[in-house]
């Protein structure tokens, strides 16, 4: 099954790589129109997933991620149109020049080829990833979670029908709809056809892909993000940054998970923070000095464990650690961080520069919320994932991250001397 799927995707990628921007945009426009026109059918299939989720007693938060409404579906169609408006990176000349030999050489952006994406309970990802891959001339094989099997199946049908209307191969976008996990393992070994694997989910999914894939894997998405409040920080402004970083949308990978506070201001600052967040239902996890201060401030607090310091909560839980100085803060981040997003709140330019230079992360912030680590916020237009690794792409992965490049060399029957 997957061998055939891989071959079809590879053949489709060959055709996609030759398309003009206008041809790709036309296909995306038809996809957006079909999402709107087929909304009743899509929502009916999504309702089946929701009913099964309730029968299986999935959490309210997970069911909410699964749910498609007329408004959300319209938002997905609008997102596809937004991708149309983005600049096409394929064919862009990165750099080049003429060598002493007279050979003209240019480095030109090209599609990667075939992308494999494994993700969990978010049907919107099906369209997000498909549209970004199509814009960059890549074919894609999608494998969503079993919780979205009905939604994904109908969404793929809509996309494939739209591709055929545009005169393009429908196998440019395919999905593994069988929930058998063995098929995931087979996809990870399909290196003859698939050029990159992008997992979108929790740490277990990323570890599975890293351990078993024979295809390059984009590692990321798991964010144990820290914010360090240094003693010179404007405390009132710092509280609003922390509020935003923790409570705006707790389930995201760029949410603050561990707050580091300098010892010299902890007794003054933490009670202010607790008071400000009192209506937000934040549960604190702390030890030693931080635990005592938070208890006295009347916070909902329990003792933090070593495992929790490495945990991406994805909720309104917040670890709080009191540290002696910036050196201790950076050391804590080195030990527990996931190289996603780290922030310092300070009035010292020297300490800010030290933090930037010494903290190893995809995004490092000075006096700002970690919530900005996002393709749209970074001006990339859209993202397929957030990478925390260092090879190929790092941070929010926009359209350019779905491309490679080739060296194009032109001569006048030029030979090497």
UniProtKB/Swiss-Prot annotation:
Its EC number is 1.2.1.41. One of its GO terms (molecular function) is glutamate-5-semialdehyde dehydrogenase activity. Its main location: cytoplasm. It catalyses: L-glutamate 5-semialdehyde + phosphate + NADP(+) = L-glutamyl 5-phosphate + NADPH + H(+). GO terms for biological process: L-proline biosynthetic process. InterPro entries: Ald_DH/histidinol_DH, Ald_DH_C, Ald_DH_N, Aldehyde_DH_dom, G-glutamylP_reductase_CS, Glu-5-SA_DH, GPR_dom. Pathway: Amino-acid biosynthesis; L-proline biosynthesis; L-glutamate 5-semialdehyde from L-glutamate: step 2/2. Belongs to the gamma-glutamyl phosphate reductase family. This is Gamma-glutamyl phosphate reductase. It comes from Haemophilus influenzae (strain PittEE).
């Amino acid at each position: 099954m997957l061998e055939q799927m891989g071959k079809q995707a590879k053949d489709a990628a060959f055709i996609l790589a030759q398309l003009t921007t206008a041809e790709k945009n036309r296909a995306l426009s038809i996809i957006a129109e079909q999402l709107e026109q087929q909304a009743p059918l899509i929502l009916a299939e999504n309702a089946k997933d929701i009913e099964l989720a309730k029968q299986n007693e999935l959490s309210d938060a997970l069911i909410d991620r699964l749910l498609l409404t007329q408004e959300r579906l319209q938002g997905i169609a609008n997102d596809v149109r937004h991708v149309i408006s983005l600049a096409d990176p394929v064919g862009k000349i990165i750099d080049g020049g003429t060598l002493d030999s007279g050979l003209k050489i240019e480095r030109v952006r090209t599609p990667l080829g075939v992308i494999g994406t494994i993700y969990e309970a978010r049907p919107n990802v099906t369209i997000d990833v498909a549209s970004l891959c199509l814009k960059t001339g890549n074919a894609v094989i999608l494998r969503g979670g079993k919780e979205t099997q009905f939604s994904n199946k109908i969404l793929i049908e809509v996309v494939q029908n739209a591709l055929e209307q545009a005169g393009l191969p429908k196998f440019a976008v395919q999905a593994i709809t069988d929930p058998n996990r063995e098929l995931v393992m087979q996809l990870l070994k399909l290196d003859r056809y698939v050029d990159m694997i992008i997992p979108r989910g929790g740490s277990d999914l990323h570890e599975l892909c890293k351990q078993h894939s024979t295809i390059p894997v984009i590692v990321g998405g798991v964010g144990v993000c820290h914010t360090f409040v240094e003693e010179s920080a404007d405390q009132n402004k710092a509280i609003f940054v922390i509020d935003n970083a923790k409570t705006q949308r707790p389930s995201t990978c760029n949410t603050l998970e561990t707050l580091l506070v300098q010892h010299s201001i902890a007794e003054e600052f933490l009670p202010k923070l607790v008071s400000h967040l009192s209506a937000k239902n934040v549960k604190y996890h702390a030890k030693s000095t931080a635990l005592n201060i938070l208890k006295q401030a009347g916070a909902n607090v329990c003792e933090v464990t070593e495992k929790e310091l490495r945990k991406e909560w994805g909720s309104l839980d917040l670890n709080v650690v009191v540290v002696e100085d910036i050196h201790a803060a950076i050391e804590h981040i080195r030990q527990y961080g996931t190289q996603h997003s780290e922030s310092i709140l300070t009035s010292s330019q020297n300490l800010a520069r030290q933090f930037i230079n010494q903290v190893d992360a995809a995004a490092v912030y000075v006096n700002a919320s970690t919530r900005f680590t996002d393709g749209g916020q970074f001006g990339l237009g859209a993202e397929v994932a957030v990478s925390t690794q260092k090879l190929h792409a790092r941070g929010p992965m926009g359209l350019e991250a779905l491309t490679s490049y080739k060296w194009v060399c032109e001569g006048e029957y030029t030979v090497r001397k």
